[in-house]
Regions:
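Conserved catalytic-core segments of large NTP-driven translation/proteostasis enzymes
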Residues: 1-120
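C-terminal effector modules of nucleic-acid-centric enzymes and ribosome-associated factors
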Residues: 82-208
Length: 208
């Protein structure tokens, strides 16, 4: 029999939010899939980058109520004291003792990126849309650090087929994690002109 890898239940909670519903008589219900850790009824979760906190009143899966949810579970959970527009798709829920990481619009992160289908050579200033977990954020290329293929430092531009280390700056706060901390939430795809042009991972976040 094929052994399934153990679920990452012993790691801090990370739950990317796919949608947020306002349900009459119940309140605000974020929906998403647990990536790591355990979501528990009665605990307080923090949503980043919205930076809102709320108690978990109930957890629902397949129309039944549960006390907890584990990695791989798709859940809706009812939170106390938050309006539906306080949080949004692209937020990640975690606990206060290990909050989900996010990069503000005045901060940067370094990513290792593979360019698959870029229409023309790109350089500093290129600002396509990054898709990371459930977030979609326009992100600017602020520094080309190295062409990983040719080992050239600070290349002037990059083209299809290149791999590179790039410093990125999101145009608005964006939840993303470092590869060494949460590989599940470090990956991103880059889309432009309606197609995926590159893929990468976040290596290092530079917080201010």
């Amino acid at each position: 029999a094929v052994e399934m890898p153990p679920k990452p239940t012993d790691r801090p909670l990370r739950l990317p939010i796919q949608d947020v519903y306002k349900i009459s008589g119940i309140g605000t219900v974020p929906v998403g899939k647990v990536e790591t850790g355990i979501l528990e009824r009665g605990k307080t979760v923090v949503f980043n980058p919205s930076q809102k906190a709320a108690g978990v009143k109930d957890i629902e899966m397949h129309h039944t109520s549960h006390a907890k949810a584990e990695p791989g579970d798709n859940v809706g959970f009812n939170v106390r004291g938050l309006a539906a527009n306080d949080i949004r798709r692209g937020d990640v829920a975690g606990y206060g003792d290990n909050e989900p990481m996010f990069v503000r619009h005045d901060e940067t992160f370094v990513g290792q990126v593979q360019l698959m289908d870029i229409p023309k050579a790109i350089g500093v200033g290129y600002t396509p849309v990054f898709h990371a977990h459930t977030a979609q954020v326009a992100v600017r290329f602020v520094e080309l650090l190295e062409n990983s293929k040719t080992k050239e430092a600070n290349p002037a531009f990059l083209k299809t087929g290149d791999a590179a280390l790039v410093r990125f700056q999101p145009t608005k706060p964006m939840a993303i994690e470092q590869m060494d901390a949460f590989p599940e939430l470090s990956r991103f795809a880059i889309r432009d002109m309606g197609k995926t042009v590159a893929a990468g991972v976040c290596m290092k976040i530079d917080k201010k």
